[in-house]
Curated annotation (Swiss-Prot):
This is Acetylglutamate kinase. SUPFAM superfamilies: Carbamate kinase-like. Its EC number is 2.7.2.8. NCBIfam families: argB. Substrate binds at G41, G42, R63, N156. One of its GO terms (cellular component) is cytoplasm. GO terms for molecular function: acetylglutamate kinase activity; ATP binding. It is found in: Cytoplasm. Belongs to the acetylglutamate kinase family. ArgB subfamily. It catalyses: N-acetyl-L-glutamate + ATP = N-acetyl-L-glutamyl 5-phosphate + ADP. The gene is argB.
Amino acid sequence: MDKTIVFKCGGSVIRELSDTFYENVRSLQAAGFKLAIVHGGGPEITNMLQKLDVKTEFVDGQRKTTKPVLEVAEMVLSGTVNKYFVSELAKHDISSVGVSGKDGQMLVADFLDQDVYGYVGEIKEVHPEMAEALMEKQFIPVIAPLSMTEECQTLNVNADLAASAVAGAMKADKLMFVTDVEGILKNGELLDVVTEQEALTLIDEGIISGGMIPKVQSALSALSGDVDEVMIVNGKGSIFTGETFKGTRIVKEKEAVL
């Protein structure tokens, strides 16, 4: 087996991942899957900004990244959060290497809108060769969502979009958004499979709402590229039974589901 899975773990769930989740990751790697992880860190960035009394503001739900905010974000993402994740993987006998999107110029970006958002990037190019080399040697690259411009200016990037871009560049078989819910629920029931059009309808109907909307939108963005399938899974429980994955699968067309 030679399949690739990219996990995206949000900052709010990283410290709540279950032992079962890590055991599943180890089992997938042992079964021959090549794995990569992209993580966020929003809550911990907020906490550190408050501790250091660095002023911040949000524009359209997105943190405006001034230079002082960028320095804290890089410290937290590449330092605290990234190395915590690497340590937790090591505790579960999983070899990983913590990097950011700056390493190997993996994520090349331009300013999204410097006047409005500050040092926030929009990804223009992905160079996954360094991460793929690690995966070939059975290391899991744990990637913090930071990027650089062609002039080597550091920019913060949205972790969901970073994961989608990395998965597309790697032509991953699956992109998994690891959350604290089982997947997409409708009337309290887990939806096993949702097509692109069904997902858009569920958003319009308000069934997909709140923080799930950007994840589903990122999933749809990934599907428009080279990713075959996106899943929303629960990192607080089991995501893999040994034969099947647990969660909601988002696919282009149901006819394509095997």
